[in-house]
């Protein structure tokens, strides 16, 4: 779902919405238009200001992210850090999460403009953990199982499992419109066992609306 109006987010929160994840993808305004030439998604300001609208509507948790591979990743993640700092100042009751998905082979065969190594991704996660001790750091199934298992002990707080990358993928089959390839194909149960083997407790849900009363 593309970024909505504040009143739409508010209605959704009143209906039980807990969190919203919206990837800015890149903070490079001119290049953003190259990647998104048409429709509402092409309006840079509408997308980047969508996080304010979420905060104004009282969304409990806001997820942010840039797509590593589009533009210089150091610039993009620095801009996201500044954006996160701004949001924390203005919507301090909201929780935040960040994600740094690296581009993988896709249906459109779009090749990354920038390559980030495993060491660089780990360095970035460490830097964000130092920058913001409380932010949730998510690592998606774009990354391989070995990397995810190791980084879960070194700064990441959330790892996905059983992900579908095609539009409507959780409701339709087969994956006819897959947007990118999944590297870690373990089932949720298998990921759960891996986390437990590390000595950690698996938490599937960490919030409920009743806690805000």
How should each PLM-predicted stretch be described?
Residues 44-47, 77-80, 121, 188:
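Aromatic/hydrophobic pocket-lining residues that form the small-molecule binding cavity
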Residues 22, 54, 84, 128, ...:
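Conserved, mostly hydrophobic/aromatic
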Residues 1-51, 56-57, 61, 70-72, ...:
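Conserved SAM/AdoMet-binding glycine-rich loop
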Residues 5-14, 60, 71-85, 144-155:
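Catalytic cores of alpha/beta
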Residues 21, 62, 158-162:
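Short hydrophobic alpha-helical runs that function as membrane-insertion/retention elements
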Residues 4, 37, 50-76, 99-114, ...:
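Conserved strand-turn element in the central/C-terminal portion of the radical SAM core barrel
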Residues 2-3, 25, 67-68, 141, ...:
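Residue-level "edge-of-site" marker
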Residues 89-213:
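Auxiliary Fe-S-binding modules of radical SAM enzymes
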């Amino acid at each position: 779902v593309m970024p909505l109006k504040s009143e739409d987010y508010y209605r959704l929160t009143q209906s039980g919405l807990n969190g919203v994840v919206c990837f800015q993808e890149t903070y490079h305004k001119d290049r953003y238009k190259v990647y998104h030439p048409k429709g509402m998604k092409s309006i840079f300001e509408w997308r980047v200001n969508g996080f304010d609208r979420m905060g104004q509507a009282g969304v409990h948790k806001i997820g942010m992210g840039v797509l590593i591979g589009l533009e210089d990743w150091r610039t993009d993640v620095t801009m996201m850090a500044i954006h996160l700092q701004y949001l924390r100042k203005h919507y301090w009751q909201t929780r935040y999460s960040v994600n740094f998905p690296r581009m993988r082979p896709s249906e459109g065969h779009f090749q990354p403009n920038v390559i980030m190594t495993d060491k660089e991704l780990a360095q970035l996660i460490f830097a964000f953990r130092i920058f913001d001790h409380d932010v949730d750091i998510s690592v998606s199934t774009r990354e391989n199982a070995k990397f995810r298992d190791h980084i879960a002990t070194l700064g990441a707080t959330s790892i996905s499992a059983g992900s579908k990358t095609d539009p409507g993928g959780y409701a339709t089959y087969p994956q006819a419109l897959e947007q990118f390839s999944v590297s870690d194909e373990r089932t949720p149960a298998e990921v759960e066992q891996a986390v437990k083997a590390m000595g950690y407790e698996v938490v599937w849900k960490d919030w409920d609306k009743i806690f805000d009363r």
